[in-house]
From Swiss-Prot:
GO terms for molecular function: dCTP deaminase activity; nucleotide binding. The active site is at residue 138. This is dCTP deaminase. It comes from the Bacteria. The gene is dcd. Belongs to the dCTP deaminase family.
């Protein structure tokens, strides 16, 4: 299994629509010149952006977080260019990009150091072979202070690994529960 380069990422995005919308280079500044958290194609990965749809954890209903019986009332929906995550709290978002992962590919997604150095941890599970959809992003604010997440800017990097043989059963073959997800998707069992 080998990591894939910027050339491969560009080719797969342009010829097979692996990433839409696709940014072939790394963007480090907004059109007006202000600095942003970078996104787009890097040497051996793709820096994904966060859309402007968020679900922020709240304790209004004082429920227990149960992944088998998740209470949607545990979140407050928010739409905007900047999401403020309360201290020691958590938020969900989704990517701007829609992904179509080839059958021979598995991805690993890692948070960007810009956020990690501020105590904001980004968690995303691997994109499995033949999975497709918008990625649900998980943000943990590990600090005792409120923390900002910027919509339409980079939040994590996706690394693409290609196997030397095709898997017997892909995510699509087994009817994965998050296949084709569109918005911020809550836990399913």
């Amino acid at each position: 299994m080998s990591i894939k380069s910027d050339k491969w990422i560009r080719r797969m995005a342009e010829e097979h629509k692996m990433i839409e919308p696709f940014v072939p280079d790394q963007v480090r500044a907004a059109e007006d010149g202000r600095k942003i958290v970078s996104y787009g194609t890097s040497s051996y990965g793709y820096d994904i952006r966060c859309a402007d749809e968020f679900k922020i954890f709240t304790n209004i209903n004082s429920t227990i977080v149960d992944p088998k019986n998740f209470d949607e009332g545990s979140f407050v929906d928010f739409k905007g260019d900047v999401c403020i995550i309360p201290p020691n709290s958590f938020a969900l978002a989704r990517t701007v990009e829609y992904f179509r992962i080839p059958r021979t590919v598995l991805t690993v997604c890692l948070g960007k150091s810009t956020y990690a150095r501020c105590g904001i941890i980004v968690n995303v599970t691997p994109f499995e072979p033949e999975w497709e959809g918008y990625v649900t992003l998980e943000f943990s604010n590990t600090t005792p202070l409120p923390a900002k997440i910027y919509a339409n800017e980079g939040v994590a990097q996706v690394l693409f690994f290609e196997s030397d043989e095709v898997c017997d059963v892909s995510y699509a073959d087994r009817g994965g529960k998050y296949q084709g997800q569109r918005g911020v998707t809550l836990p399913k069992t």
